[in-house]
Amino acid sequence: MSRFEEQRQWGNLTRNLKRGVLALKENAVVQDGRVYDQNGVDKSHLAELSVKTTPAQREALQAVDELSTHELENGHFVFAFFESCKTMAERYPAFTQPDLARLMFIGTYTGYQTGRLQHDNGKVIDKRALETLIGISRNRFAEFYRKLIDADIVQEQGGEIHINPSVFFRGPLKESGYKLSEYSHTRMFRKTVRDLYAIYKGRKTAQLAIIYAVLPFLNFRTNVVCFNPQDSDDDLRAMNLDHLAALLGYKDTDKLRRALEGIVIDGEPVFWLPHNAKDRRQKRIVVNPRVVFAGPAESLGAVKVLFS
């Protein structure tokens, strides 16, 4: 109700009713969501309960709502774990870039708290179903699956496939059953990753591995790729494209740039490459929060606007 409407309705009240409302305001008792006057008479029809918040509290609540909406729009999330500033190539030396992209994809099918690979409707994804889901040849799948087993990423239990909670987990982290303090983690949004995997098939699959590869260097609040992602904002050292290329094993920086700029979801770039303000020959790297975002709710809007 607008302020003008409130004033109009107040002016239409009789003198006795106005006196009663003012008395109710001074002496009201709230019980079980109902409003009673000093005589115990229910006056809920004359009163409206509201929570009084400060501007800062209202902004925080709005930010939380925005994060919840963001999670819903992008298919909710799975926690992806990694060791900060340690490349995925170091953690999984046997994996090719397409392997890393496939690993990221199957992580989105991690069951809530169980770690079991399953569809959103609860249907179990066994080994044969996983081969179909990934969409590669039988021989290539057999090789990939063997790598998953050897790296202790998945285990078979009674025909079901369970994923290691130190790689992907859905649910409260205290329910994982693992000590995960040595790892960092981020929210990886399931629908976005699945949509990207459906778009970038065949030879293009390797491009998606870059998303997974940059996670250990991603600052949580800003989604900027950094040398020191865990430090405070004032101390962050953003990584240039040249450095990222060297880190990921690209001999040609321009090839990496084209790969990054070529990944798009619903018309939005997955990577934004702004120029370094102090040296326009250098480019920074920012990741679209529709794919991954680990920051607090109040930081989301500032990152999203870069991609809108």
Predicted segments with their positions:
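Short recognition helix of helix-turn-helix/winged-helix DNA-binding domains
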Residues: 1-120, 158, 168-236
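Winged helix-turn-helix DNA-binding recognition segment
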Residues: 1-22, 26, 112-163, 223-282
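Short, cationic-aromatic polyanion-contact patches
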Residues: 126, 159-181, 276-299
